[in-house]
Amino acid sequence: MRDLDNLKEMIARHEGYEPRVYKCTNGYDTIGYGFAIKDLYMDKEVSDLILDQKIQQMLKRILSHEDWGEWFPGKPQAIKEVLIDMIFQIGFSGVRKFRKTIQYIKDDNFLMAG
């Protein structure tokens, strides 16, 4: 498979890598090593791998946050799952706007938080 490795290195070197969507010279939305989004298909296996990675990134961010890192680990699993789902949907900064709800959760007043 050495030939495949060489080919991969050559394409990567020539194409370059862009982690965000951009317009290629032909005007197509493109990402990564010049992958035109219109031609991409993401199967469930790849989607699951990306979701696993996103969840790990969210947990790392939560646990490294100066406030959340202190109280989040001690909450019931169901509460943590709801918060992670909210973060996935609207982002960490979006969830942090729910100041009263977060305070209720910190105080273990889950009825008021809901």
Spans of features found by a protein language model:
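Acidic, aromatic-lined catalytic clefts of primarily extracellular/periplasmic carbohydrate-active enzymes
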Residues: 1-114
